[in-house]
C-alpha cells in the first residue's frame, strides 16, 4: 500500500533525476525509466488527488534556470510534451482527440523529435531580438548573445509573409560530426569527454564567453509557432515551408497523417534513418494539425492536450563477452566490467559494459564467452540485460570476484551490510590513488579545468603527483614532459590550477573525501564552520547540533580529522595557496570593492569571466552585464567589446588586469 510518505519520496526522486538531466546534464537512468517513474507518480495522484501540491513534478515543467544568466518571462508558456513508448498509447491518444474535437477524422502533423535543447526565438520587424531557454516553462535564461554565435541562425529574416512580430520554438543541437571532432580534441587535451551531443549542446549554450560558444559550432532548427505569432498560418503542416520562405532553418522529415497506420509507418521510416541522420533524435512528435483545434483543447498540467511524443525505446543488440575485468574505484570498491566484442549501437561503438557487482553477475549468471543482449538508452552507460543460455560455450565456468586486488595484490574484504567488495589498501593501492586524484580535480571537487583523467594518470606515472596537494606544487618543467603538451596547453593547465585555489568551502570539503559526506552535508558543514580550520576543531557534540547532520556523519568527520595524515594534507594544501571560502562568511571586510559595481569585458589572462566575478563578489562588490552611469569600474581584458567604448564615453574608470589584481589584494 502506497503512503503519502512514499509519494513524497517519489516526488523527491523525480526532481533529483530532473536536476541530473536538465541542469547537470549527467543522467543516471534512461528516458524510459524516468517516464516510468512519472507514470507511477500520475497513477498515485489519480488515486490520491488530495496529496498533490504545486511542487509535484507532474504540475511543473522541468526547471533548468542557470546562475550567470538573466532570466526572462516567456510571453507564451513553453510547455513540455507527454511521452509514450507504444503503438497502443498512440492509438489511445488519437481516440481521445477524436472525442475532444468531436470529429471522426482528425488530421495530424508528425515530425522528428530532436534530442537537443528547446529554445524560443523572438524576431521583431524581421530582426532577431531574443533567445530564451525553456527554463521552468514560465521563465527561462536569456541566451540571446550566445544564440547570435550559432552560424545557421539568421539574424535578419525576409519574405512576403513575414509578420512584424514572430515568436518561434526550436531546438539547439550539436551536429554529430562536430561532436565527434570536438570530443577527439578533448581526448587529446586530456579533458573529460561529453557523453553525447545533447550534453555538449547544453553545456555550450550556458558558456559565459560567446567566443567559446562560436567555437562549439552549434546549429538550430525551428518547428513551431507560439500562439498568435502569425495569423496567416492556420495549420502545423504549413509551418516548415513558411519558415523556409522567410529564411529560417526548419525541420526536415515531416508527414501529414490521418490515422494510426500512417503515423506508425512514418515512425518506422524514421527509426530506420535514425543512425544515419547528421543529428540525434529520440522519437517523433504527433501534433493536431489545425491551430483552432489546438487552441480549443488547451493544456493539462504542464503539457498540451493536442500533442504527444512517441519516444523510441532504448536500442538493443547481441554480442559476446570476451572477458570480465575488474575496475577499482577511489573508495576501493571492485566493479566487474564486461569486455565485449565491439558492436555499433545507438550511434557509437560499444566495447564495455558495467556489471555493477558480484551479486548482479551471479543473479544473471553472466560468464566469459556468453552471448548477451546489451542495451543503451539515452545517456546511460551500456548494460547487459540477459544471457542467451542456448548459445553458452560447453565448458564455461561461473565468474567469481578475485580474492586479491588486481592493482596492489591486497586481500579484498566484504563489509557486513554492503554488497560491495573492497580493497582495504587505501594508502598504497595504485588504482585507488589515481582514482582519488581524478575525483579531486573533477567538477564535484576542485574542478580543475584542462586536467582530465589521462593527464592525471601521466602525472602519477611520472612520479610528479602522489597526493592531491602535489598538484599545486607542479612546475611548468614537469608538465612540459607530458605527451603532446606544447606551450599553450602548459599555460592553460598552470592557469587552471591557479584559478582552482579559490574554491568554495563546501567543494573543498567534498574534495577531502570524508566518508558519508555528499554536497548537501558539505554545504551544512561549511555554513556552520565558516573555515576549514574551524571544521577541523569541531567535536561530535558540536557537529550533531547542526540540523541535518547525524551521529554517523559527525563521527566520520571527527575521525577523518583525527588522522594526522589527513590533517597534514589539509595544511599543505593551505600552504600551497588553496583558499577555501564559505559563502556565508564575509572574508573581506571594508574592502575597496564593497558596494561597487563592476562590468567585465574582454578575455583576462589569469582568470575566466566567472572566477573574476567570484573575486569581486567575495570582496563585497557586484557584477553587472551592462555599463551605465551607476557602474564604478570596467575591467578590460584582451579584445574588449563595446562596453569599453561606453565606459570611456561616460568617464567610468577602466582597470587593466594588473590593476584589477592589485586592487583585489
From Swiss-Prot:
Pfam families: BRCT, DNA_ligase_aden, DNA_ligase_OB, DNA_ligase_ZBD, HHH_2, Nlig-Ia. NAD(+) binds at residues 31-35, 80-81, 111, 134, 171, 287, 311. GO terms for cellular component: cytosol. Its cofactor is Mg(2+); Mn(2+). GO terms for molecular function: DNA binding; DNA ligase (NAD+) activity; metal ion binding. Residues 588-665 form the BRCT domain. Zn(2+) binds at residues 405, 408, 423, 429. InterPro entries: BRCT_dom, BRCT_dom_sf, DisA/LigA_HHH, DNA_ligase, DNA_ligase_AS, DNA_ligase_CS, DNAligase_adenylation, DNAligase_N. It catalyses: NAD(+) + (deoxyribonucleotide)n-3'-hydroxyl + 5'-phospho-(deoxyribonucleotide)m = (deoxyribonucleotide)n+m + AMP + beta-nicotinamide D-nucleotide. PROSITE patterns: BRCT (PS50172), DNA_LIGASE_N1 (PS01055), DNA_LIGASE_N2 (PS01056). GO terms for biological process: DNA repair; DNA replication. Its EC number is 6.5.1.2. DNA ligase that catalyzes the formation of phosphodiester linkages between 5'-phosphoryl and 3'-hydroxyl groups in double-stranded DNA using NAD as a coenzyme and as the energy source for the reaction. It is essential for DNA replication and repair of damaged DNA. This is DNA ligase. It comes from Protochlamydia amoebophila (strain UWE25). The lineage of its organism: Bacteria, Pseudomonadati, Chlamydiota, Chlamydiia, Parachlamydiales.
Amino acid at each position: 500500500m502506497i503512503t503519502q510518505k512514499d509519494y513524497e519520496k517519489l516526488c523527491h526522486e523525480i526532481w533529483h533525476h530532473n536536476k541530473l538531466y536538465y541542469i547537470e546534464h549527467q543522467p543516471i537512468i534512461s528516458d524510459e525509466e524516468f517516464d516510468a517513474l512519472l507514470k507511477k507518480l500520475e497513477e498515485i495522484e489519480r488515486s490520491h488527488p488530495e496529496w498533490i501540491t504545486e511542487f509535484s513534478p507532474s504540475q511543473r515543467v522541468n526547471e533548468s534556470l542557470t546562475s550567470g544568466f538573466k532570466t526572462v518571462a516567456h510571453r507564451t508558456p513553453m510547455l513540455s510534451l507527454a511521452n509514450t513508448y507504444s503503438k497502443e498509447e498512440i492509438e489511445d491518444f488519437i481516440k481521445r482527440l477524436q472525442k475532444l474535437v468531436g470529429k471522426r477524422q482528425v488530421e495530424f502533423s508528425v515530425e522528428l523529435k530532436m534530442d537537443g535543447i528547446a529554445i524560443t526565438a523572438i524576431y521583431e520587424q524581421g530582426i532577431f531580438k531574443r533567445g530564451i531557454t525553456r527554463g521552468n516553462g514560465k521563465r527561462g535564461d536569456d541566451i540571446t548573445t550566445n544564440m547570435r554565435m550559432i552560424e545557421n541562425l539568421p539574424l535578419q529574416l525576409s519574405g512576403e509573409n513575414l509578420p512584424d512580430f514572430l515568436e518561434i520554438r526550436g531546438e539547439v543541437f550539436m551536429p554529430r560530426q562536430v561532436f565527434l571532432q570536438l570530443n577527439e580534441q578533448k581526448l587529446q587535451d586530456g579533458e573529460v569527454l561529453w557523453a553525447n551531443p545533447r550534453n555538449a549542446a547544453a553545456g555550450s549554450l550556458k558558456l559565459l564567453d560567446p567566443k567559446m560558444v562560436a567555437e562549439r559550432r552549434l546549429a538550430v532548427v525551428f518547428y513551431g509557432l507560439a500562439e498568435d505569432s502569425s495569423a496567416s498560418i492556420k495549420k502545423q503542416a504549413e509551418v516548415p515551408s513558411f519558415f523556409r520562405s522567410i529564411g529560417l532553418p526548419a525541420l526536415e522529415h515531416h508527414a501529414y497523417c490521418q490515422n494510426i497506420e500512417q503515423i506508425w509507418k512514418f515512425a518506422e521510416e524514421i527509426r530506420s534513418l535514425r543512425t544515419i541522420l547528421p543529428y540525434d533524435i529520440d522519437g517523433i512528435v504527433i501534433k493536431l494539425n489545425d491551430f483552432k483545434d489546438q487552441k480549443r483543447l488547451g493544456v493539462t498540467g504542464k503539457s498540451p492536450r493536442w500533442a504527444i511524443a512517441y519516444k523510441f525505446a532504448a536500442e538493443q543488440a547481441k554480442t559476446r563477452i570476451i572477458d570480465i575485468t575488474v575496475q577499482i574505484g577511489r573508495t576501493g570498491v571492485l566493479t566487474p566490467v564486461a569486455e565485449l566484442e565491439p558492436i555499433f549501437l545507438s550511434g557509437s561503438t560499444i566495447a564495455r559494459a558495467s556489471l555493477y557487482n558480484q551479486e548482479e553477475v551471479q543473479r544473471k549468471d553472466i560468464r566469459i564467452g556468453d552471448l548477451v543482449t546489451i542495451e543503451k538508452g539515452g545517456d546511460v552507460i551500456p548494460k547487459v540485460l540477459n544471457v542467451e543460455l542456448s548459445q553458452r560455450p560447453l565448458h564455461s565456468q561461473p565468474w567469481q570476484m578475485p580474492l586479491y586486488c588486481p592493482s596492489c595484490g591486497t586481500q579484498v574484504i566484504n563489509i557486513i551490510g554492503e554488497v560491495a567488495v573492497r580493497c582495504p589498501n587505501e594508502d598504497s593501492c595504485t588504482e585507488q590513488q589515481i582514482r582519488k586524484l581524478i575525483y579531486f580535480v573533477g567538477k564535484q571537487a576542485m574542478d580543475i579545468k584542462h586536467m582530465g583523467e589521462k593527464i592525471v594518470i601521466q602525472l602519477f606515472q611520472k612520479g610528479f603527483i602522489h597526493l592531491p596537494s602535489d598538484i599545486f606544487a607542479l612546475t611548468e618543467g614537469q608538465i612540459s614532459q607530458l605527451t603532446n603538451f606544447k606551450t599553450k596547453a602548459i599555460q592553460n593547465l598552470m592557469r587552471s590550477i591557479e584559478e582552482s585555489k579559490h574554491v568554495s568551502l563546501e567543494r573543498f570539503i567534498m574534495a577531502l573525501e570524508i566518508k558519508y559526506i555528499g554536497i548537501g552535508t558539505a554545504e551544512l558543514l561549511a555554513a556552520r564552520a565558516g573555515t576549514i580550520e574551524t571544521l577541523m576543531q569541531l567535536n561530535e557534540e558540536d557537529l550533531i547540533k547542526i540540523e541535518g547532520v547525524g551521529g554517523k556523519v559527525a563521527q566520520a568527520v571527527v575521525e577523518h580529522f583525527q588522522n594526522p595524515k589527513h590533517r597534514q594534507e589539509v595544511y599543505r594544501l593551505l600552504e600551497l595557496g588553496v583558499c577555501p571560502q564559505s559563502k556565508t562568511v564575509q572574508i573581506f571586510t571594508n574592502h575597496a570593492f564593497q558596494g561597487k559595481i563592476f562590468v567585465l569585458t574582454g578575455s583576462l589572462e589569469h582568470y575566466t569571466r566567472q572566477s573574476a566575478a567570484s573575486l569581486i563578489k567575495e570582496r563585497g562588490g557586484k557584477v553587472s552585464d551592462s555599463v551605465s552611469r551607476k557602474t564604478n569600474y570596467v575591467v578590460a581584458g584582451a579584445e574588449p567589446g563595446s562596453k569599453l567604448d561606453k565606459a570611456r564615453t561616460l568617464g567610468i574608470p577602466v582597470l587593466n588586469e594588473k590593476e584589477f589584481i592589485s586592487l583585489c589584494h
